[in-house]
Regions:
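Active-site bordering "gate/hinge" segments
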Residues: 1-308, 315-318, 324-327, 385
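Dual-mode signal for accessory low-complexity, basic/Gly-rich regions
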Residues: 283-399
Length: 399
């Protein structure tokens, strides 16, 4: 089945198109992004159960972006009050106040050109087997409870076994003078984890996740994920400490993805090029890896949780080759940063929610597959480690 596009947004579209036309008389550029996303979050352990109709990506609202004389401003609202004429007048009034404050405080703002607005009409509904808003939550809680109980029996020294999941049916609509874009897709994530002490009393917690562009059917994979926890727990309980030093390592796809995202990906988010906060700008066209290393970034790279059709600035999703056989070719870029740098946007302008500013953010950051088998790679290492699985990886930085 297709993830159905929001009837609410379809009903809102005519008034928003009228709003854009009204504001277009006062500004050099006008667009509006509207979202309507529904879903759930679920957590089940031996001691607690939690079910919520909200998660990090459930939302409903709109944000207007305008440009005049090189200055961009935004106005966000949850519901469209009154007539488009009244809202247009309120937006003009509020944004003029913002500009007055900037003038009074002497804030130096970026002067940016007008965003391109090539004509485009796009409607995308992605495939899913089930919808989060129609999921039988009672049955899902019962299933997770049974899995938690099974985990307690399977995993040695388990003090608890927890399962968490979230699923969201996302609808987004982008309207400008010449563009009318609509998309809907479902993404789902689930994790099972067990907790238990080693002989020194340190808590070890093996975990395994499932995720993808699809509905709650993805959570069916948690049964197999749970079966992997006992072996991992046994290895964690018996693992010794590594003697500090330098070693050759082989990384599994999970660790390789972590390195690609945290150690490299953030450094080529090009809004940081604008602010001179990223070393990546100094390495474009230079060697940053071996001939075997080619890396892609983009929502089109894989049907994962970020496999959208267009980003939050109305730019179509892309597949960017960031590293080509070891040479850094480019980074990723939101639309405004692209204008300031004189490059093309890559479809990576993302908002935490509709009311937040769009930043350059990653989607799928992946290495191309190589030609060598794992056994060959292991045979090439005299002494080292095979790294599998991670517990964290957040690079702390301020946009």
């Amino acid at each position: 089945m297709k993830a159905p596009f929001s009837p609410y947004l379809n009903g809102l579209a005519p008034r928003l198109r009228e709003l854009v036309a009204l504001l277009d008389k006062s500004y050099d550029y006008v667009s509006v992004l509207s979202t309507d996303s529904v879903g759930f979050r679920l957590s089940v352990s031996q001691s607690a159960k939690s079910v919520s109709g909200t998660n990090m990506t459930t939302e409903r609202g709109s944000v207007v972006r305008v440009c005049r004389d090189g200055q961009y401003s935004e106005f966000a609202f949850n519901e469209m009050p009154g007539s488009p004429e009244a809202l247009a007048e309120e937006i003009r009034k509020q944004l003029e106040r913002q500009l007055e404050v900037l003038k009074l405080t002497g804030v130096k703002a970026y002067e940016t050109g007008v965003l391109p607005d090539e004509p485009l009409d796009l409607f995308v509904e992605k495939d899913t087997e089930r919808l989060p808003e129609r999921e039988d939550m009672k049955a899902l809680v019962e299933r997770f409870t049974a899995l938690s109980d099974r985990g307690m029996k399977l995993v040695p020294r388990a003090l608890d076994c927890e399962l968490t999941a979230s699923s969201t049916n996302i609808s987004k609509m982008f309207i400008s003078k010449n563009r009318f874009l609509r998309q809907s897709y479902v993404y789902t994530e689930g994790v099972c984890a067990a907790y238990g002490p080693n002989d020194e009393g340190e808590i070890k917690y093996p975990f395994k996740g499932v995720s993808g562009c699809g509905g709650p059917e993805i959570l069916d994979g948690l049964d197999a994920a749970l079966e992997s926890l006992p072996k991992t727990m046994e290895e964690l309980l018996s693992a010794g400490k590594i003697e500090p030093g330098e070693y050759e390592i082989i990384t599994d796809p999970e660790i390789s993805g972590l390195i690609a995202h945290e150690a490299f990906g953030h450094g080529v988010e090009m809004d940081m090029f604008v602010k001179n906060r990223a070393l990546g700008a100094d390495y474009i066209g230079k060697r940053v890896g071996s001939e075997l290393c080619t890396m892609h970034e983009g929502a089109l790279c894989e049907e994962s949780v970020t496999a959208y059709a267009f980003d939050d600035e109305g730019v179509l999703a892309g597949d960017v080759t960031e590293i080509d056989r070891g040479i850094l070719k480019t980074g990723i870029c939101d639309a405004l940063s692209a204008l300031r740098l004189g490059v093309e946007p890559t479809g990576n302008g993302k908002r935490e929610n509709f009311a937040h500013k769009a930043y350059t953010r990653m989607t799928n950051t992946i290495f191309d597959s190589g030609a060598h088998r794992l056994e060959e790679m292991i045979a090439s290492v005299q002494y080292g480690y095979l790294l599998c699985g991670e517990q964290s990886g957040m690079e702390v930085f301020i946009k």
